[in-house]
């Protein structure tokens, strides 16, 4: 039986970003240096395949520092942690390595700087996401106000409208965030923003690639985890950019082939914490069902690399 033809558009950039790559390397190098087990507070990155792979090598994932023993190293996830976490680790004399993405750390420093200058902080982010919790936890409880939507901006209660600054989560929708920033600037004309956009280069680049790809596609799949903020945003961006069917899949086994019946083109991308092996698995699944012609939609070239902490570059 002849397979139906399918044009498969592959977004570039896609998949791993520099912060995720660094965080995974940190866990692997810590296991090399100190042996198993190494404890990791929260999933190092939001991807089950990656976490399961590290668990098999001897990483133990916990949600709280209190679950870590005193005599084993602990790593903080790429999303960042409240200031209270390293303080508690120091009080227990724990060996710890902070795998917070440097671009998240930049937001932490920004929030602290604005607070030191007497400005009240507003954070644009998703409630409960570990990155939001970590950034808000850089300052005393109640000092950072959280807004998610322009509607939230209308009701937020501030101390002094003339003394405000905002930061954002790094993995948000660029367009949605622009709407929230606009609402903040309309209501609080004196609000201070970041010197450089807080939404990171990788989030922005992956969304731009999807915007370029989506209008060409009958359907689009984003390889990523349901708890990955940046992956979920890619699905939303694809739908908004005109793709009729945009769906999140963790692996090829999640593909709903019935929903794709009759398509002649598909777009494939992946969130920043999804490894290339899972993307290749999805492409192989389409190769098995269709006569595939592959086209790359490239909107940016990435060559960012972040060094791992010095403690892991030194011999044991």
UniProtKB/Swiss-Prot annotation:
Active-site residues, Swiss-Prot/TrEMBL: 131 (proton donor)
Pathway field: Isoprenoid biosynthesis; dimethylallyl diphosphate biosynthesis; dimethylallyl diphosphate from (2E)-4-hydroxy-3-methylbutenyl diphosphate: step 1/1; Isoprenoid biosynthesis; isopentenyl diphosphate biosynthesis via DXP pathway; isopentenyl diphosphate from 1-deoxy-D-xylulose 5-phosphate: step 6/6
Domain of life of the source: Bacteria
CDD domains: lytB_ispH (cd13944)
Cofactor-binding details, from the entry: Binds 1 [4Fe-4S] cluster per subunit.
Reactions this protein catalyses: isopentenyl diphosphate + 2 oxidized [2Fe-2S]-[ferredoxin] + H2O = (2E)-4-hydroxy-3-methylbut-2-enyl diphosphate + 2 reduced [2Fe-2S]-[ferredoxin] + 2 H(+); dimethylallyl diphosphate + 2 oxidized [2Fe-2S]-[ferredoxin] + H2O = (2E)-4-hydroxy-3-methylbut-2-enyl diphosphate + 2 reduced [2Fe-2S]-[ferredoxin] + 2 H(+)
Protein EC: 1.17.7.4
GO molecular function: 4 iron, 4 sulfur cluster binding; 4-hydroxy-3-methylbut-2-enyl diphosphate reductase activity; metal ion binding
Binding site for isopentenyl diphosphate: 46, 79, 129, 228-230, 273
GO biological process: dimethylallyl diphosphate biosynthetic process; isopentenyl diphosphate biosynthetic process, methylerythritol 4-phosphate pathway; terpenoid biosynthetic process
Protein family according to the UniProt entry: Belongs to the IspH family.
The protein, known as: 4-hydroxy-3-methylbut-2-enyl diphosphate reductase
Organism name: Roseobacter denitrificans (strain ATCC 33942 / OCh 114)
Name of the gene: ispH
């Amino acid at each position: 039986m002849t397979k139906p033809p399918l044009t498969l558009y592959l977004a570039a950039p896609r998949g791993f970003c520099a912060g995720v790559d660094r965080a995974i390397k940190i866990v692997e190098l810590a296991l090399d240096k100190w042996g198993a087990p190494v404890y990791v507070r929260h999933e190092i990155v939001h991807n089950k395949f990656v976490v399961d792979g590290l668990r098999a090598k001897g990483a133990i994932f916990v949600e709280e520092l209190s679950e870590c023993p005193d005599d084993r190293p602990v790593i903080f996830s790429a999303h960042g942690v409240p200031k209270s976490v390293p303080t508690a680790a120091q009080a227990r004399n724990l060996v710890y390595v902070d795998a917070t993405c440097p671009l998240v750390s930049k937001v932490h420093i920004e929030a602290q700087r604005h607070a030191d200058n007497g400005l009240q902080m507003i954070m644009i982010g998703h409630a409960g996401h570990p990155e939001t919790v970590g950034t808000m936890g850089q300052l005393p409880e109640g000092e950072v106000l959280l807004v998610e939507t322009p509607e939230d901006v209308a009701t937020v209660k501030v101390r002094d409208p003339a003394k405000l600054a905002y930061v954002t989560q790094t993995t948000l929708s660029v367009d949605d965030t622009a709407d929230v920033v606009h609402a903040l600037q309309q209501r609080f004309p004196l609000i201070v923003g970041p010197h450089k956009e807080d939404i990171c280069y990788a989030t922005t680049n992956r969304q731009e690639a999807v915007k370029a790809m989506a209008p060409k596609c009958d359907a689009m799949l984003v390889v990523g985890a349901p708890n990955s903020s940046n992956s979920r945003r890619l699905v939303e961006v694809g739908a908004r950019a005109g793709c009729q069917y945009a769906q999140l899949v963790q692996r090829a086994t999640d593909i709903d082939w019935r929903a794709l019946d009759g398509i002649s083109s598909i777009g494939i991308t992946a969130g920043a914490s999804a490894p290339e092996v899972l993307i290749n698995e999805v492409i192989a699944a389409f190769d098995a069902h269709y006569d595939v012609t592959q086209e790359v939609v490239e909107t940016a070239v990435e060559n960012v690399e972040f060094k791992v902490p010095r403690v892991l570059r030194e011999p044991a």
